[in-house]
Each structure stands twice: as structure tokens, then as C-alpha cells.
Amino acid sequence: MLMLLVRGTHYESLRSKVVLPTPLGGRGTEALVSECPSPDTGIRWRQSDEALRVNVGGVRRLLSARALARFPGTRLGRLQAAASEEQARRLCDDYDAAAREFYFDRHPGFFLGLLHFYRTGHLHVLDELCVFAFGQEADYWGLGENALAACCRARYLERRLTQPRAWDEDSDTPSSVDPCPDEISDVQRELARYGAARCGRLRRRLWLTMENPGYSLPSKLFSCVSISVVLASIAAMCIHSLPEYQAREAAAAVAAVAAGRSPEGVRDDPVLRRLEYFCIAWFSFEVSSRLLLAPSTRNFFCHPLNLIDIVSVLPFYLTLLAGVALGDQGGTGGKELGHLGKVVQVFRLMRIFRVLKLARHSTGLRSLGATLKHSYREVGILLLYLAVGVSVFSGVAYTAEKEEDVGFNTIPACWWWGTVSMTTVGYGDVVPVTVAGKLAASGCILGGILVVALPITIIFNKFSHFYRRQKALEAAVRNSNHQEFEDLLSSVDGVSEASLETSRETSQEGRSADLETQAPSEPPHPQMY
């Protein structure tokens, strides 16, 4: 009986340690209950006051539960309060159960600033990250703009508002000339179309050879040949306009008429004509090849450089069609269709647009096109300023010079003088002679300098930006390893699930090897925060 009493008393005493509000080591009953879990709730996968061991981009730290509990809405705060391992894995990139370490593949520099946030409650802007990357990191870790310190909030908001207009500023910062991710994604989407096409890999390689001069040695040779043909075509067109060739063609036409033959058949020099046929054949080959190899026919006809290629060969074929309409392959016909001959001459004049084909091989011309595309507002402002200035000063000059016979007879006639003066060209064909007219001309010239200089500065800054950006893109392609570039292209073709699994295993092994390599240089225990 005594033994049972003692056992009953011992049982009651043990029960009282759990139920009664008796403090133990400064902690209440709730702490004691947490150490003795109930069979209904199960054993917790990690203690609530256990420090959190994290690895962010190779930077290992040990975070205290008390610091994380102050910010339960952040990612690390939710990770600390996770009720199960499955819930915790959804908040991190990887978890090492043996080392009880959470891995995050994020920017390590931002993580160091995040540690300062958990200590002080304020987040400071990092100059090494652009505002968009900084905002993405802050959103990932569960921080908002309210977490920014007062000393950095105004600077962050100002940089975020001015970042879309970074190309308006003459800045040499890397963020102003780095390739845009949208451009890279557009190229990848275009190349991905070859995956489902017939002979897609061969077509993709040929397309890149024709479009990217720095892709390979054949692409460089193709670019050199294309430039040579364009220059030869322009040179032939210029030589054809020389007086010596004009006189030679006129004499040949007279001799043909005397012999009873058509003068149109001998109008062109045979050498220049053969050179023209060769250039047209090459241009036609380029256009047809790019059209057949293009990943998207719709996008092909929307690209400005492709439209230039089409316009460069279109006059030749329109001339042939006009010759057929005139009833003769040489372009002659009856008197009733004589006016079509002048249309043929207009078509021949359109050959001058072939010089624009050099834009495909010239960084400066492509940068100029991009500048004009993004400067339509500034160009409109420039034209508006010129129109207002020309109208005002032309009226003043007409009033001052209308009594003199110097060419200022009407206001529309004065517009030519005002335009030439405001653009500071000054042909001198029409000049004022009165004192009032000279004062008006002086004001027109000075006003033109001020009016033209304002928008031109903005346009020049944009051109500098696009030129540096294009150079950076070309340097990235030129300095990149060819095999790495092939691997990048192969990635858009689509890979099997087994290949993806192998890639993930290789990445995991590489990351583990990196951690093992870094382990000896790190302290035995991560720093506690």
C-alpha cells in the first residue's frame, strides 16, 4: 500500500509539473508543454526557437529566431514559422536535411543588406543593383517600399522614375548600355520557331550566318561579299551619270537609228549593264534566301532592313514590267505609251535606295535609324520651332524689304530665306539691304542657333546611347565562346525530360562541389545574427 501511495504521489507530482503554472528556468508552463509534445499534435520538425541556417548565393549565416520573429511577413520570417518541412521547402530553393541548411539562389550582396534590415528594421539601397533588380530582390524576400530607410527612399523613387529615360542622359554607366532582356527573349522566341520546322537546325544556322556577321567565319565572308556588291552597284550608278558615258550612249543611239535599229537596245554601256545584272541577281538571292530561311514570314515583312532589300531590287523588275507593257523588252513602245518611259526613269532613279542596304552591316546607320525612331517627339518639336521662327521673321523681312527689288516680294517667297537663315546655311541668293531687314536677319540667325540647338542635343544623346548599346551587343557576341553560343541555341530546340533531370543533377553536384571548396575558407560556424 505504501508503494502504491508513493507511486501515486510521484505520478501526481509529475503531472503537476506539466499542468500547474510553475515557472521553470524563467519560462512559463507553455515552454514546458512545448518541450513535452502531446501525442495528438505530433513531434515538431524543428524547434520554434532554433536558429535558422541559410546559404544565399554562397554566403552562409545563422539567423536567430528572435530577429526573424520581429518580421513574420518576410520570407525568412515565414520560413522560421513553417509548420512542416514541405511548407519550408516551398519558401526556399533547396534544403539540406543533414546540415539543416536552407539554400537560396539569390543575390548575395542584397542578402547582406537584408541582414542589416533584420537588425535595424530599415533597408538601404545598393548602388551595385539597378532599381529594377533591387525591387525584384525586395519583393522576393517579402519587403515593400515602406521598409526603405528615409535616407534612401527619395533616391530610390527618383532612380526608378528616371530609369526608363536613361537613354536621354549622356551616361556611361553599364545599366544604360546593357542589352535589354526583352531583346534577348525576342531572339530566343524567334529561334524557337525552328524547333518544329523541317530542317530547323540547318535553317537556323543559315539564318544566323546571313543575319549576324560575327557569328562565324562564313558569316563574315558573306557580309564582305554583300558590302562589295552594294558598293559596286552604287559605283556603277554614279559612273553611268558621268558626261563621258552620256555622250557615248548618245552617239551609240544615233548610230542605231541610222542603222534602222532601236536606240534603246544600245543605250547602256555593256560592262555597266552586266554589272547591274550581277548585282540584281545577288540582291534577289539575298531577299529570297532570307525570306525562305526566316523564322516568321510576317515578321520578315515588318523588319525595316528587309523592306530596304525589297526596295533595292523592286525598280529593276518594275522596269522590266514597264518594258513589257510598252511592247518591247528594252523599254520602247508606241507613241501612245510614251509617258511610261518617264515612269521607267523614275524606277531607275529608285536604285539610289540601295545605299541603305549598308545599314545591315553598319553600326552607325542602325543606331541612326533607332535614334530617329525614338526621337519623333524631338523632331516634331524642332519642326515646330522652325515653323514658328520662319513665319515670324519672314513676315518682318517682307515688311522691311517689300519696297526693294531684292526678292522679298511675297511672304511665301520669304519663307525660303527664313528657312535658310534659321538653319544657319546662308546661301546668299536673297539678302536684305535695309537696316530693318538686316536686323530681322540677325535675329533670325541667332534665333535659329538657339532653337535648333535645344532638340539637337537630346537627339545626339540618344544617338550616343544607341551607338554604345549596339557596340556592346556586338562585343558580347564577338567575345562569347562559340560552343557556349551553340549550347544557347540548342536550348531553344527543346530537350527531353531525361536531359533536364541530368542537367539538374549536374547543377546540384556543381553547387555541392562549390560549397565543399568554399568550406575550408569559411569559419567553422556561421556568423550568428
Curated annotation (Swiss-Prot):
GO terms for biological process: action potential; potassium ion transmembrane transport; potassium ion transport; protein homooligomerization; regulation of potassium ion transmembrane transport. Residues 502-514 have a biased composition (Basic and acidic residues). The keyword Transmembrane helix applies. Keywords: Cell membrane, Ion channel, Ion transport, Membrane, Potassium, Potassium channel, Potassium transport, Transmembrane, Transmembrane helix, Transport, Voltage-gated channel. Pfam families: BTB_2, Ion_trans. GO terms for molecular function: potassium channel regulator activity; voltage-gated potassium channel activity. Residues 494-529 are annotated as: Disordered. Gene3D superfamilies: 1.10.287.70, Potassium Channel Kv1.1, Chain A (3.30.710.10), Voltage-gated potassium channels. Chain C (1.20.120.350). Its main location: membrane. Residues 412-423, 424-431 dip into the membrane without crossing it. Potassium channel regulatory subunit that modulate the delayed rectifier voltage-gated potassium channel activity of KCNB1 and KCNB2 by altering their kinetics, expression levels, and shifting the half-inactivation potential to more polarized values. While it does not form functional channels on its own, it can form functional heterotetrameric channels with KCNB1 and KCNB2. Each regulatory subunit has unique regulatory properties that can lead to extensive inhibition, significant changes in kinetics, and/or substantial shifts in the voltage dependencies of the inactivation process. This is Delayed-rectifier potassium channel regulatory subunit KCNS1. It comes from Macaca mulatta (Rhesus macaque).
